[in-house]
Amino acid sequence: MTTLLLMFVVSALPPAASADSPNQVIYSEKTFADGKTRHFTYKTVDGIVIRYFILKSSDGVIRAAFDACDVCWLENKGYSQKGDFVVCNNCGKRFPSARINEVHGGCNPAPLKRNVENGNVIIQVADILDGKRYFNFQGGKR
């Protein structure tokens, strides 16, 4: 099982990010201090590219979510940031940054578990893999 996990690839990491183990991805909390969303990808062994984003919301909390939702995921368009809102690039619905990772379902960005410890944002690879269903288009529309 460890060999399988070592085959995962993390890409699109900002300069301050590091993958310290095959089980977690670590980013410096400072990377998100400006409140702008940072988008990342995680490529699985079977070639599925899982997209997610992290931002520091207007209330000062580091939040993470998959770049997809329960409703629009098949369109594969994700989210963009407009001021203090995260906006669905498919349907145009707007979500306050302070609600990301708290509200789920519908067109809300699907929450991604994260922890902030000792100045680092830590995401477990297993939690990233839980979002694979939003990016697996085999047999789907794409």
List PLM regions with ranges:
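N-terminal pre-ligand scaffold of iron-sulfur
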Residues: L13-Y79, R114-R142
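Short Cys/His-rich "knuckle" micro-motifs
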Residues: N76-Q81, A98-I100
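Short cysteine/histidine-rich metal-coordination sites, predominantly Zn2+-binding motifs
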Residues: G83-C91, E102-R114
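Short Cys/His-centered divalent metal-binding micro-motifs
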Residues: C91-S97
